[in-house]
């Protein structure tokens, strides 16, 4: 079992039950999944960019990404329906906890001028989205082998009903919020 999962079961659940006044252990919010997405508009001209991005995403998450395709054609972007335009990975269970642990303890501190993450990026239902400007903050990525700096989106899905519950859970998990 992942270190963060054990910590959640042994320490975070009782702390959340006490803080939020939950009567049943099933009311306590928990992580459902983490979706890591890399959108690549440049993949329209050069498909090789997509292959390198998929390799990097696999190294970061430890799981093979799925190639995302365009849902509809947009003439202004020279985009046709079904063209590959990105890649995404959905992490669950132990891999999810291990990824979050590495993100909080290793990757986020490597961001230049890091002062914490915004507490306003919740969606109203307790889920949190985070944008990373460059994939180089992850220790799995070798700086010399990177041909182009790419950003990625990380969405943390929880069972929390409100943003306050979700923020309390993620704060206990170690996410460094600014406010």
UniProtKB/Swiss-Prot annotation:
Q: Could you state one GO biological process linked to this protein?
A: translation
Relate the protein's function as given in its record: This is one of the proteins that bind and probably mediate the attachment of the 5S RNA into the large ribosomal subunit, where it forms part of the central protuberance. In the 70S ribosome it contacts protein S13 of the 30S subunit (bridge B1b), connecting the 2 subunits; this bridge is implicated in subunit movement. Contacts the P site tRNA; the 5S rRNA and some of its associated proteins might help stabilize positioning of ribosome-bound tRNAs.
Q: Which Pfam families match?
A: Ribosomal_L5, Ribosomal_L5_C
Q: How does it assemble?
A: Part of the 50S ribosomal subunit; part of the 5S rRNA/L5/L18/L25 subcomplex. Contacts the 5S rRNA and the P site tRNA. Forms a bridge to the 30S subunit in the 70S ribosome.
Protein family per UniProt: Belongs to the universal ribosomal protein uL5 family.
Q: Which GO terms describe its cellular component?
A: ribonucleoprotein complex; ribosome
Which gene is annotated as encoding this protein in its UniProt record? Answer: rplE
Q: Please list the GO terms describing molecular function.
A: rRNA binding; structural constituent of ribosome; tRNA binding
**Could you tell me the keywords of this UniProt record?**
Ribonucleoprotein, Ribosomal protein, RNA-binding, rRNA-binding, tRNA-binding
- What this protein is called in its record is Large ribosomal subunit protein uL5
